[in-house]
Amino acid sequence: MTPEPAFLLHKRPYRETSALVELLTLSQGRVRAVAQGVQRPGSRSRGRLQPFSPLHVTWVGGGELKRLRLMESRGATALLAGEGLLCGLYANELLTRTLPVELPVSEVFAFYTALLEALPRPDARAGGLRRLEVSLLEALDALPRFTTPDGGELDPQVRYVLDAFSRAFRPGQPGLDGRTLRLLGAGDWDAPGLAGPSKAVTRAALAPLLGSRPLRSRELMRQLAERRRAKAGS
């Protein structure tokens, strides 16, 4: 096969010297594979197979679990720390948990690549995350419909909550006002003043896909925020 652009989403030890890996690839989406020998001391592939590092990979195997053959770097690893690192870990965990195996999601791949470029800049993180989340929801046919459950227009003066069954909005509290939701429905996900509402909508839309098990990366971000508040108040 032609070398495929990819990023590592998750890796865990397998047997003595190998690893089970989850990859996000350009044309095949999420791919599960065995990386043989990468845990062996001195393995050249060990240093390449790292999160946030652009890769070229090839694999063999017709089942769900592939065997990696080629692992080459195709660029510099994104250098992330603190909140930027936690946002990157969140993106990796989100994609691992929600993407079906081998569903082509080239737009998700493009927005993930753009996110890694944005994460070192604090002012660009939220917008990058929302664009990735929206592209993921679109790929999974789970993006909210910015209407009422019966297809009616949202009233700018009424507050709404997302109905998970219909993926539309019904009146409810505390909710978001119809004017804000109509702006989001027009695609203004990172317009000024919409950072909080867009985060609330994507989180609500992703919740049914994630199920009841919490994301570890969200807990780490909560702990970081608490430490910052405690430090600011001391």
Where are these regions (language model features)?
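Non-catalytic alpha-helical scaffolds and adjoining flexible linkers that form interface surfaces
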Residues: 1-20, 24-234
